[in-house]
Amino acid sequence: VAPQKSSFSIEPGFWSLNFHKSKKFDIKYFGKPHLDIFEKAIQNIFKISQRKFNLDRIAMIGDSLHTDVLGGLASGISTVLVTNHGLFKNHDYQKEILRTQIYPDWIIPSI
């Protein structure tokens, strides 16, 4: 489920969770906040740069605590929450951070 301007929309993750609960399907999640997508991105960064470096030099920049920030934190990279765009535009991001206990490394209004 994803927040919209005045309601919520049902997203693919909702349907896959229902399939998983039915035990009729074996579900493999690939996408934020699951580690596979972050590990793949980190591998690509190392491949393109032709060297490895500390993960704290890589940052996940996004507008969602539950996908962008949570996934970045779980994968060991820095996280940057953008607040004047996307999910938190015109919303109290500080209240949501306290409610969820998901703390980004950095908070910026825009890129």
Q: What do the predicted segments below correspond to?
A:
Residues 1-111:
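Asp-based, Mg2+/Mn2+-dependent phosphohydrolase catalytic module
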